Amino acid sequence: MSDKKYNVDEGEIAKFSRIADKWWDKSGEFKTLHDINPLRLDYIDGHADLCGKRVLDVGCGGGILAESMARRGAAFVKGIDMAEQSLETARLHAALNNVADIEYECIRVEDLAEAEPHSFDVVTCMEMMEHVPDPAAIVRACAKLVKPDGMVFFSTINKNPKSYLHLIVAAEYLLKFVPKGTHDWKKFIVPAELARMCRQAGLDVADTKGMTYHVLSQTYALCDSTDVNYMFACRPAF
């Protein structure tokens, strides 16, 4: 097994560990994730049909997406994260809400890919890659974990002045949607770069969607613009 510290930002782990008990507070630090989760879930289910599938959620945090995929009909959902405190929150919430066929493990995705290659119908890695030193390694591991006829989903944040204004200046400092320091603009990823990572990992990008926030209605919606938040739906190229 490789060095457990590789591709792990200890500062990011500590940051999310400090607020691990807030994951299921829909008006707290993770409100935005709760708000966009129905969009993410429908996008994934629309492309991959979760019913009866084995699913892996990489960087699952407190289990917001993982639990919703289990409720949508997945046969088995595994969530992995490097913040054990977040996983404890996820396990407790699933147990209290009688969500079956779901498990959580503190393990790097690269190590899981070595242990269980080509073992999941669906692999999701949402709002996670902008928090690690080497996102390309994450993409390669996800590609190794998915079955040849499966699908991999990524979501992250574009790197441009608009995303800086929306996600850092507005979301962190003006509107206070998320705590200050949640995002590091230097780690944002332009879609062309993520597409290159996917190709080099043996994945074809089948679809791309963006997400936009409507200020007046205070709701999120899918859109064709990838200027800020965006998602990829990918298939193995071989």
Swiss-Prot record:
GO BP annotations, alphabetical order: methylation
EC number(s) on file: 2.1.1.222, 2.1.1.64
NCBIfam families the UniProt entry points to: UbiG
Keywords, ordered alphabetically: Methyltransferase, S-adenosyl-L-methionine, Transferase, Ubiquinone biosynthesis
Annotated function: O-methyltransferase that catalyzes the 2 O-methylation steps in the ubiquinone biosynthetic pathway.
Chain residues that bind S-adenosyl-L-methionine: R40, G59, D81, M126
InterPro entries to which the protein is assigned, alphabetical: SAM-dependent_MTases_sf, UbiG_MeTrfase
Pathway(s) it belongs to: Cofactor biosynthesis; ubiquinone biosynthesis
Superkingdom, natural source: Bacteria
HAMAP family, A to Z: UbiG (MF_00472)
Catalytic activity as recorded in UniProt: a 3-demethylubiquinol + S-adenosyl-L-methionine = a ubiquinol + S-adenosyl-L-homocysteine + H(+); a 3-(all-trans-polyprenyl)benzene-1,2-diol + S-adenosyl-L-methionine = a 2-methoxy-6-(all-trans-polyprenyl)phenol + S-adenosyl-L-homocysteine + H(+)
Membership in a protein family: Belongs to the methyltransferase superfamily. UbiG/COQ3 family.
GO terms assigned for molecular function: 2-polyprenyl-6-hydroxyphenol methylase activity; 3-demethylubiquinol 3-O-methyltransferase activity; polyprenyldihydroxybenzoate methyltransferase activity
A Pfam family this chain is assigned to: Methyltransf_23
Protein name: Ubiquinone biosynthesis O-methyltransferase
Enzyme class name: transferase
